[in-house]
Swiss-Prot record:
Domain of life: Bacteria
Species for this entry: Bacillus subtilis (strain 168)
Protein name listed in UniProt: SPbeta prophage-derived uncharacterized protein YomV
Length: 236
């Protein structure tokens, strides 16, 4: 399904083996932010999360059971809340609701990955080594603290730079919003480096049309802070 990403910018439904899957628009995100965050959790991150609350060992049988199963089985047989979350999201994005019955163990991973990609959501990275995991978590936290742009900043920049109204942006997909914002940043960087290049030969002029990867690890995902900002912007 990787080749389908080339057409995500159109915001049109994506044809799959079970029918068309549509994007969730920004205006509808307040109703789905929690569920999309739950879809982001893979088997390892679920086990890690439950292990955090297992200091007394009371959850050992439950965690052992999850380790025996794949994500599809965990979602459909072990964690009712996650089953409801997946059902809510799939019911929203599937054009033909009858296609829900076509989702099974054989195609669940591909469809889940497609939905995550369509909404610029990346899975949490979980490593087996505790020390490496701690280092990764610290690194992730520092990167998030270092980031100065939250969702409302991104929306306001896209509105100001492109002349969109907030109503028009509310009809965008998350992919379109991020793509517009980071292309805008490349253009602004190009203009800045071009200006400085006139006074300093050492300045390298950036390429405003360079490839934008919206799937860099930890770089672009819907955080809890973003979710709250969406609710404030489009939640009415």
């Amino acid at each position: 399904m990787n080749e389908l990403k080339d057409f995500f910018f159109l915001g049109k439904p994506i044809q799959t083996e079970i029918g068309e899957i549509d994007f969730i628009r920004l205006k509808d995100y307040p109703l789905y932010t929690k569920e999309l965050s739950m879809l982001r959790m893979n088997k390892k991150s679920l086990i890690k999360e439950y292990s955090r609350f297992n200091e007394d060992g009371s959850l050992d049988p439950f965690i052992i059971e999850m380790k025996k199963r794949d994500l599809y089985e965990i979602v459909h047989s072990v964690l009712p809340d996650f089953h409801e979350a997946y059902f809510k999201v799939f019911s929203k994005v599937l054009i033909n609701k009858d296609s829900l019955s076509l989702i099974g163990k054989h195609n669940f991973p591909r469809l889940r990955k497609l939905i995550l990609d369509m909404h610029c959501i990346t899975e949490d990275k979980v490593v087996d080594n505790d020390e490496l995991q701690e280092f990764h978590d610290i690194s992730k936290s520092l990167k998030q603290q270092d980031s100065q742009s939250d969702l409302k900043d991104i929306v306001s920049c896209v509105a100001a730079f492109n002349g969109y109204t907030y109503e028009e942006i509310s009809e965008m997909t998350m992919y379109q919003l991020y793509l517009s914002f980071y292309r805008m940043a490349e253009v602004m960087n190009y203009n800045t480096t071009t200006l400085f290049a006139t006074v300093s030969p050492d300045v390298k002029v950036s390429d405003w049309s360079s490839h934008i990867n919206l799937y860099k690890e930890e770089s672009y995902h819907l955080s809890t802070k973003d979710a709250k900002n969406i609710e404030q912007l489009f939640g009415g």
